[in-house]
Amino acid sequence: KRSQQQLGYEVMPSDSKIKAEIIYNRIDLFNRLYKYDALIGILLFFLVVANIYKERKALKFTISGFRYLIYLLFVLHTAGLILRWYISGHAPWSDAYESILYVAWATIGMGIALGKKSDFTLASSTFVASMLLWIAHQNWVDPSVANLQPVLDSYWLMIHVAVIVGSYGPLTVGMILGVVSLLLITLSNSKNIDRMKISVKELTIINELALTIGLIMLTIGNFLGGQWANESWGRYWGWDPKETWALISILVYAFVLHMRLVPGLKGRWVFNFASIVAFASIMMTYFGVNFYLVGLHSYASGDQVITPTFVYYTLLGVIVLGGISLYKYKKVYK
């Protein structure tokens, strides 16, 4: 150990960082958080649905308690990211694992910001964040704390990546709010239609706000990426798969937010369904480019990549939910 400290003192982590990493690995915070997030998010969702059918003081009190639990989980998530930042010595969004943790953090944070008066928003964002954390702990994602890759050793990591990856947070919130809105439309009947209409209208407004914030961040992040590309490779744009799909995502969400100006594409069902479908462009930009396509931003090696089975089930679920909710929307809402 003495020889390591004498000869490698420039790269050897300090004793405090070693102790911090031991604590970090022992706690295994993020692996635990996704279970707590999922449980609390699901329970809060059902409590809010029950409160729509019949308001009770006990339910409102319980819902308020769950909100504070989510605030606590968000604080723990933030503390975990800060601890990982301290241990690694770089911003915690430099690889696949860290970026998923960051997107989950941005999703809950946006849910808290937009869900001050909407329990559905808070519950939904917490649940979808738990799914992101669950994905981060699959066996194909490496959770180890590693040295920063030389190509990422730039101040732009703090700026470009933070903004563009952070934009996935509000866009994820928009997607899950679209799902919840269609679920509420599906559950609507003659007895609860008035309350359901209010909830769907509220969620649609918040959804539009979330998508607007996400689109602004995504656009700014793309321009910042061009600045970094110019410094690194001597050009602002090279039609790299990541750059191309980021541009496609911008165009897709710009269309979704302006659909109300197109005759025949107005209405809450159309907007909410479009917010779900549009998220496929983000999935392609993040997961698809990283693991399927070969480029400057990707991890793909040219080997065959097997698409997880749950992707096909998710696609089928979206189609079924869209069809049933459209039938209910035409029958009950018009």
Task: Tell me what each language-model feature is.
Residues 13-28, 146-161, 300-305:
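Juxtamembrane membrane-water interface segments that cap and precede transmembrane helices
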Residues 1-44, 55-57:
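Extracytoplasmic
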Residues 187-200:
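Membrane-interface interhelical connector segments
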Residues 30-53, 63-90, 94-146, 159-186, ...:
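Hydrophobic cores of alpha-helical transmembrane segments in multi-pass integral membrane proteins
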Residues 1-8, 138-139, 152, 156:
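Generic secondary-structure transition motif, activating predominantly at the C-termini of alpha-helices
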Residues 4, 8-12, 174, 191, ...:
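Residue-level signal for secondary-structure boundary elements
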